Amino acid sequence: NPDYCELTAQYWAWKNIDVEYYGFFHYRRYLSFNDSLKEKVDNWNIVTKNYLTKYETNAMHIDNRYLKQIENMVDNYDVLTMKPIDLKKACGLTVYEQYKKDGVRLHVKDLDIMLEIINEKYSDFYDIAKEYLNGYTAYIGNIFIMKKELFNSYCKWLFDILNEFEKRVDMSTYSVEGYRTPGHLGERLFGIYYMWLLNNRNITSKELQLYFFSNTDSCKELQPAFSSRNIPIAMVSNDNYAPFYAAMIRSLLDNLNDNCNYDLVFLHRDFKKKTKELFLKLIKDIENVKIRFYNVGPLFEHSNLNAS
């Protein structure tokens, strides 16, 4: 559902899966289950990494070797979520003001309507909702692990509010991002609900460090591009050297042996999409030449390589 963003998966899980706990990580964001791991955070209280590698999953205790540890931690709490963002430090705005500032994509009147719905249908949440929206503490991304009973109650509350919102608001003139308004509201609603639980229910909770990975593509083992007569040619390059390699490939194409298949592989870390398109254009309609691009960034993320 394009309107509900990641909440689409949450709704499906609510309606189709019966488990003891429900958990969601989204948009290359993960919680670390290693309490002793202390890394530098940005102003948004997030640890940012270039690549999600085995090194990171091991350090964060989120690979298969730590399943028992994860299970034990989850069993001890009703809710696990991210360590919150201090918006005063990050941008100097409250939760409400931050939403209002994003006036190009979002409309603050929608946040006001959401608040009206809470007041009308769930008045016991209203004061907490106002406190959360007017405060500087934020929980983003709908990222959490929650016990079944709480999750079911949360989803019933959440989707009832969003359903009522869609009845009241005409989004037909909204931008593509504007259509995602229910998903954006859902982020704020999680913070409100979590804050309400902390203040009104005797729950146990734990807040974990949030990590963001710019690239989560895995490095798969390369196989030959052709099943026979495969001649591999590996090249190390970046965008700066692309024109020189284009000249080299042009020379190769002028001297091809029709009895051979040429498997050209660029080992790179930062080729732009346009660069790749231009290389592939060189071999258009040439059946015995393939060009592939292999991002080696994850392999060398924690290596110190010096060029002389």
What are these regions (language model features)?
Residues Y193-W196, S251, N255, L278-I286:
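Alpha-helical structural signal in soluble globular domains
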